[in-house]
Amino acid sequence: MSETGRAEVTEDQVRSILRVRRGRSRIFGEGLFSDPAWDILLELLAARLANRKITLSELSEVAPKSVLARWIATLEEKGLVTCELNRFRTDDFRVALSDDCADRMIAFLSSARHLAG
């Protein structure tokens, strides 16, 4: 925990989790672990920790854009992400974790790290 009582999770730690998950897909095949929701949330957390805004197009490594759009809509309905239209590209928008989701993910990843350690 930090001095403020908040769990510490770094962008590098989140990126490491993403690399492991992608390696798992390479070994076991793409279709076996096909639900992209967790990977979307991890990508958005990594972007937030790096103080970057990310667009739907930038998430295309996670899943095809049509699949991403459906999942982003579901995550937005659940209050886990927020969306902001891109005024320069009407076919793209910025996506970010809600503050509550970011806090919950950091708490989860911090507790998971302590369980593994």
Residues of each region from the PLM?
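Short alpha-helical segments that sit at the start of domains
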Residues: 14-42
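A short, conserved structural fragment
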Residues: 76-87
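Short, amphipathic alpha-helical interaction segments positioned at domain boundaries
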Residues: 99-117
